[in-house]
A protein has these predicted regions:
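N-terminal small-domain helix-loop-helix segment of the aminotransferase-like
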Residues: 2-104, 112, 288-291, 395
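Helix C-cap/helix->beta junction micro-motif
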Residues: 30, 140, 195-196, 318, ...
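PLP-dependent enzyme catalytic core of the Aspartate aminotransferase-like
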Residues: 86, 90, 94, 124, ...
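Conserved core segment of the aminotransferase class I/II
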Residues: 222-302, 309, 313, 393
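Conserved glycine-rich beta-strand-loop-beta hairpin in the small C-terminal domain of fold type I
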Residues: 282, 286, 301-312, 322-335, ...
Length: 395
């Protein structure tokens, strides 16, 4: 038999393996020192109480003859889809129930959506980039081109009219840089996509961190986006579902290519290859959008926002350039002293006992930059920020 040779084209990812080895070596050499991890991309606050209660109630319901649920609708139960509709409507965006598809997370949908598109399409991704965008397309054999970003454009790449792309990845607020597009910038991308008959895959996993009312929480706040974009969303960061697994994707009915409805194709794909998200999980997700759920979730988000401000304030005191933090859980900083990304990693670990993520691990344009996250413990984040501030000032 023949294998998919494109898997052999995947670059070996040593980023987090190397981080783990370096941290282990440091701990062995300095067993008395406490290491603070600010490189984690996972949440640390527990699920909201109302979410846990909803799971308990749904599990108990499943234990009764009257309340048992077997296979559910592949595209999600109406009660959750309607709750998501209300979430969009509360921000002034109207989405139809049959445009919402419940999934086991954004990462799955980002990969599975590609099955609707031919492998001859050209893909445009930013650099630095969330590695999954690249790997998903390498394994399909698509051509990938990069939108190079840097300090000069705030790590927000803009359309290049000399470049023709068919599939465009946008993540705003961005992972890893924390940068967020303005409405005007998103409109430029929408116009570019429509002009080139391209489709935007809009990763909105971090929209819940946006506190600036001038920034869009959804691509569908932008005129024309319903004709060129799919929005992929997650419960992981808004509600701490990284270990529970639930997300959703919005596919507008207006979105068509070559006379085919992307909405209908995605429905067919899901009903063919996916059996849906468990009833208990969907009940938990629906609880997120209740009045008490939103209040509890905001409390957790504020916890992470305070952590981000603590880190940002420390960098401000040191005069270190950074982006993100305000509308994002990620702080993307310029390595002080013109250090390279891994050089700064070693320096930070040795001098501060703090672990972050070297920017070069996200692409060539990440060299000389570094990612810190706000997902840690509040007291440890304060301690880490103080250590970083003291050490940088002593450089």
């Amino acid at each position: 038999m023949k294998m998919n040779k494109h898997y052999n084209e995947l670059k070996a990812s040593y980023l987090f393996v190397d981080i783990a080895h370096k941290v282990a070596a440091y701990q062995e050499a300095h067993p008395e020192k406490e290491i603070i991890r600010l490189g984690i991309g996972d949440v640390t606050q527990p699920l909201a109480k109302c979410v846990v209660q909803a799971m308990r109630d749904a599990a108990a319901e499943m234990g009764t003859k009257e309340g048992f649920h077997g296979y559910g609708p592949e595209q999600g139960y109406p009660f959750l889809k309607q709750a998501i509709q209300g979430y969009y409507a509360s921000r002034g965006t109207q989405i139809a129930e049959d445009e919402i598809f419940i999934s086991d997370g954004a990462k799955s949908d980002l990969a599975n959506l590609l099955g609707l598109f031919d492998v001859d399409n050209t893909v445009l991704v930013p650099d630095p980039v969330y590695p999954t965008y690249v790997d998903d397309n390498v394994t399909d054999g698509r051509k990938i081109i990069y939108s190079r970003t840097g300090q000069e454009n705030g790590f927000l790449g803009m359309p290049d009219e000399s470049v023709k792309a068919d599939i465009i990845y946008i993540c705003s607020p961005n992972n890893p840089t924390g940068a967020a597009y303005t409405r005007a910038q998103l409109k430029a991308w929408v116009d570019y996509a429509r002009k080139n008959d391209a489709i935007i895959l809009y990763d909105a996993a971090y929209e819940c961190f946006i506190s600036d009312g001038e920034l869009a929480r959804s691509i569908f706040e932008i005129e024309g986006a319903r004709q060129c974009a799919v929005e992929i969303c997650s419960f992981s960061k808004i509600a701490g579902f990284t270990g529970t697994r639930c997300g959703y994707t919005v596919v507008p009915k207006e979105l068509e290519r070559e006379g085919m409805s992307i909405n209908k194709l995605w429905l067919r794909r899901q009903t063919t290859k996916f059996n849906g998200v468990p009833y208990v999980v969907q009940r938990a997700a629906a609880a997120v959008f209740t009045e008490s759920g939103m209040a509890e979730i905001q409390s957790n988000l504020d916890y992470y926002r305070r952590n981000a401000k603590v880190i940002a304030d420390a960098l401000d005191e040191c005069g270190v350039w950074y982006c993100g933090g305000k509308n994002s859980p990620y702080i993307w900083l310029r390595c002080p002293g013109n250090m390279k990304s891994w050089e700064f990693f070693d320096w930070l670990l040795e001098n501060c006992g703090v672990v972050g993520t070297p920017g070069v691990g996200f692409g060539e344009c990440g060299e000389g930059y570094f990612r810190l996250t706000a997902f840690g413990d509040a007291e440890k984040t304060k301690l880490a920020a103080q250590r970083i501030k003291t050490a940088i000032k002593a450089l």
